[in-house]
């Protein structure tokens, strides 16, 4: 059974690469209902749209529709970019399938809580099996914050703190 069969999206060991400070900032900013820009590509043309997203364990989770252009584009090219709240990143888009399937139960329950303010406003049809969870596994990115520049790469000593006078936290995942 792979990760998609159990309704999770592994962030390419990115979480082991982020410093505890960077992870804390990611959770504070994105571990709730947040709007991010999601960019996909179709025939060498970028397409950007705002989506509601929730961050957990190196991945963003988004409720969307399987027949939407964004999912069609991700099926052709899973490489995506995101941006929001002083954060930019690349990742891999992965359709986890129907929101209501048993394998997605844990993340779906979290999304119901996180998106409680709008989830039942009629925009989503949870009886429709095309209502799906999109997972964006982060591969690399840049997080801006207060006073620290942290790099994370593939080396054994993955996190190095430098130049505390700057407001930059940076990380690189394994697929970069």
Predicted feature locations:
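Charged, gly/pro-rich active-site loop segments
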Residues: 2-17, 88-176
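Short, basic, glycine/proline-bearing loop/turn elements
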Residues: 8-12, 48, 52-59
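A short, Trp-centered hydrophobic/proline-enriched beta-strand micro-motif
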Residues: 28-43, 79-83
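Short solvent-exposed loop/turn micro-motifs enriched in small/polar/acidic residues
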Residues: 31, 45-46, 73-75, 126-129
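An N-terminal domain-start capping segment
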Residues: 35-54, 134, 167-176
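Hydrophobic residues embedded in beta-strands of well-ordered beta-sheets
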Residues: 46, 60-61, 141
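Residue-level marker for the onset of beta-strands and adjacent loop->beta junctions
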Residues: 49, 78, 130-132
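A short mixed-secondary-structure module that forms the rim of ligand-binding clefts
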Residues: 54-88
